[in-house]
Amino acid sequence: MNDTRNEIIRIGNELVRSVGYNAFSYADIAKALNIKNAAIHYYFPSKSDLGVEIIERNIKAFNELTNHWKSLNYKEQY
């Protein structure tokens, strides 16, 4: 996957966690990465597209961390 795209997602994720989804803009990401807003729009035409990607990656990471729990017995899970 493209490094710029991954960096946009990484910074977006950091901003969601630190200031919240509604409190950051593409300009904040562009400034952090020293790129133009248009570069972000190339990968994510709307902020909601970026938000969905961030959520999907977090869900995937959570599932990867917790998948092994299914093989544990009830007491080991807790």
Can you say where each PLM-predicted feature lies in the sequence?
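Short, basic, alpha-helical segments at the C-terminal edge of helix-turn-helix-like DNA-binding modules
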Residues: 56-63
